[in-house]
Design a protein with these regions (language model features):
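Generic detector of well-ordered alpha-helical packing
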Residues: 8, 27, 53, 85-88
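Switch I (effector-binding) loop of TRAFAC-class P-loop GTPase G-domains
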Residues: 1-19
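Inter-motif core of Ras-like GTPase G domains
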Residues: 34-56, 62, 66-72
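Short, solvent-exposed loop/turn segments at secondary-structure junctions
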Residues: 31, 57, 88-90
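Conserved beta-strand segments of the P-loop GTPase G domain that flank and frequently precede/overlap
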Residues: 24, 48-52, 81-84, 113
């Protein structure tokens, strides 16, 4: 089922005894919500660019979303490319290699998820929150770079999950 409007959710996470509130906006990439989307880019600390691996058109819009992020978001904002619906791999229209390639082009991480089966959803949000918390409290505060030199996070901590974040390192 596709989103048919703007969906807004709050997700509360506790990390190291610190409460973190994530505001999650889902515009389903619809042009009619572009004004809303671009205004929220300005205050965002992280942007998850989500496409449907079973829908080529969805993937083809990634470049447009990245251009909007470059134009409207603050410099160094954490960006992650997310291929959703990995539970429907048999209907895949976008290969993992192709998705990794575009993520590499932008110097960001790539992960595949399934919102339906909640595959790596919690890992994605928790790791994003941990990264942001480290930049606010213990990090440089710039939001730029990590140990591997990219604007990204490493979700490879949980080796038991087969749909992990790909390092995209050359």
């Amino acid at each position: 089922m596709n989103s048919i409007g703007v969906d807004f959710k709050l997700k509360n996470i506790e990390i190291d005894s610190k409460k973190i509130k994530l505001q999650i906006w889902d515009t389903a990439g619809q042009e009619r919500f572009k004004t809303i989307t671009t205004s929220y880019y300005k205050g965002a600390h992280a942007i998850l660019v989500v496409f449907d691996i079973t829908d080529r058109d969805s993937f083809d819009h990634v470049r447009n979303w990245m251009a909007d992020i470059d134009k409207f978001a603050k410099e160094g904002v954490l960006r992650i490319l997310v291929g959703n619906k990995c539970d429907l791999a048999h209907s895949r229209q976008v290969s993992m290699e192709e998705a990794k390639e575009i993520a590499n082009k932008y110097g960001i991480k790539y992960i595949e998820t399934s919102a339906k089966d909640t595959i790596t959803i919690d890992d994605l949000f928790i790791s994003t929150a941990k990264y942001l918390l480290s930049k606010q409290i213990g990090g440089t505060g710039t939001g730029k770079g990590t140990e591997n030199g990219k604007n990204g996070i490493d979700l490879m901590n949980n080796n038991n999950n087969q749909h992990q974040m790909n390092n995209n390192q050359s």
